[in-house]
Regions:
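Aromatic (tryptophan-biased) beta-strands that constitute blades/sheets of beta-rich domains
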Residues: 1-76, 81-83, 91, 101-108, ...
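Repeat-blade elements of multi-bladed beta-propeller folds
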Residues: 10, 63-92, 106-133, 160-193
Length: 205
């Protein structure tokens, strides 16, 4: 977008915790022009690429993908910066919204498939390595991390070794609490987690 245009922050996926994908801003689309472009060295690596193989129970074939939630890098924006996770180099990036300059990169041990959350100048996100992280939005330094389940065996998924409980949800922050889930296989337990957004400690509720 043109650097001279100011807009409301878009701090979470689809704007807000209700996923409204709406903003009160009024912009004239016909005057918008690209100001810069950031290009990944490789295309995104979805967790479940291609269509569903088939429905064994109903005997159906030729189904569309049911888990196509990460075909692109979903972007959030706040305080003049752009943030997004990558399934290519297992990271979250922060770019200057006016220039596209990379301000910092925070690497993880697995793909970051869902857009991060900006809250109180912190960035919250999960990764396929089974860890949720909170980093400083200015510098990208780690504030806290939380793993719902101790690391045990790893399994092969999408050409990568990952734990049984990757974090493939966003992190919803509300009332001082960060909510997220860890799950993968239907025959293994799933975890819905609530931790203190400031400290990363489990709330016990």
């Amino acid at each position: 977008l043109q650097p001279s245009i100011n807009g409301e922050d878009w701090p979470v996926f689809q704007h807000d915790n209700y996923r409204s994908a709406l903003t009160s801003e009024n912009l004239r689309a016909e005057v918008l022009e690209p100001a810069w472009v950031w290009q990944s060295p490789q295309p995104p690596q979805p967790a479940w690429s291609g269509p569903a193989k088939w429905d064994a129970y109903a005997g159906l074939r030729g189904l569309r993908s049911m888990r196509n939630y990460d075909p692109v890098f979903h972007v959030v924006s706040a305080s003049g910066r752009v943030f997004f996770g990558s399934t290519v180099d297992d990271s979250v990036r922060c770019l200057d919204a006016l220039t596209g300059e990379t301000l910092w990169i925070h690497h993880t041990d697995g793909p970051v498939r869902i857009s991060p959350t900006f809250h109180n100048n912190r960035i919250y996100f999960g990764s396929d390595d089974g860890v949720v992280r909170c980093v400083d939005a200015d510098r990208g330094t780690l504030i806290w991390s939380f793993r719902p389940k101790p690391l045990e065996r790893l399994i092969l998924n999408n050409g990568r070794l990952i734990p049984f409980w990757p974090i493939r949800t966003g992190v919803l922050v509300r009332g001082g609490t960060a909510y997220f889930a860890a799950s993968l296989l239907p025959w293994k337990e799933s975890y819905l987690c609530a931790v203190d957004a400031d400290t990363g400690k489990a709330t016990g509720g």
